[in-house]
Amino acid sequence: MNSLAIFFALTAALSWALTQTMAKIGLQRMGLVSYLFVRPLFALLFIVPYGLFTSGFHLPYPKLAGIAILGSFTDAFAGTLLYMFAIKISSTHKAASLANTAPFWGVISAVLFLGEKPKLIIFIAAILVALGAYFLVISKGTKSVDYSFWKPLTALGTGILWGFAETVPAKYCLTHGMTPITYQLILVLTAAVSWGSVACLRSKNHHLRYPLRGLRIALFTSFTGFFLGWILWLSSLKLALASQLAPIRGGAMTLFAFILSIILIRERPSRYSYIGMILILIGVFFVSILG
């Protein structure tokens, strides 16, 4: 495989993992709605100039806009909402590991919605992912689950939504002539409108605060998440097959997020969490390579 493609995929994974981890700090300094509303607005400061100075923004026909909005809403609003809720109620390394099963659910989505033929390896990977999810939510020093049923489910739901959005709507739009930067612009605009609507409704009964410390984190994660991560990932896709790069991105994101949560947030995973992370990595790797 092209070594530059591997480098782009790994750096994209690091960028997104850093975004996931720093979001925990951002939510400690800023309200959820305020944080998620300003991030796409900040991202426009990077995406619009980049698009204007490179390939520009092109939309072959209006139908693609609707499909792109659907994928963007699923990814940037519904999926992000579940993930932010997950890291507020549980540790980042657990939430990120479950959310980063997105490549696995992307293959499932391709089978269900794009008509691709399922393989036995998909079901084997599903068992590994389920076992990994179980080990991730086991308390340190015990064999009991320390979270309610809904807490790990929110992070796993994030992975399902992200996997669907990255596979079905995105693939359809890009294969029908939409440029990557155009899809990226629609993604950010959809996020801005969605979270802006929520912010307007929320502000009627609650005062939304935008502290400078929180805005700095939001600006940083808008660059690493909405802009840099996507640019690097799309650059890697130009140099190698997506099926080759998916396990690199998915596995690396899980590993990077796990390590960064320990370094930056001082989380202390249990030994069961390490087992869970390994099982999920194997499951994602199997289904991405052989599925």
Predicted regions and their residues:
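Residue positions within transmembrane alpha-helices of multi-pass solute transporters
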Residues: 14, 18, 78, 105, ...
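MFS transmembrane alpha-helix packing/gate-lining sites
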Residues: 15, 75, 102, 161, ...
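Juxtamembrane helix-start motifs in multi-pass secondary transporters
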Residues: 35-36, 95, 183, 245
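C-terminal transmembrane-helix exit sites in multi-pass transporters
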Residues: 83, 103-124, 134, 254-274
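Membrane-interface interhelical linkers
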Residues: 1-34, 38-70, 80-90, 140-156, ...
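Hydrophobic transmembrane alpha-helices of multi-pass small-molecule transport proteins
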Residues: 42, 47, 107-111, 120-140, ...
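Alpha-helical transmembrane segments of compact multi-pass small-molecule transporters, enriched
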Residues: 42-46, 98-112, 190, 194, ...
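Selected transmembrane alpha-helices and immediately adjacent juxtamembrane segments
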Residues: 149-182
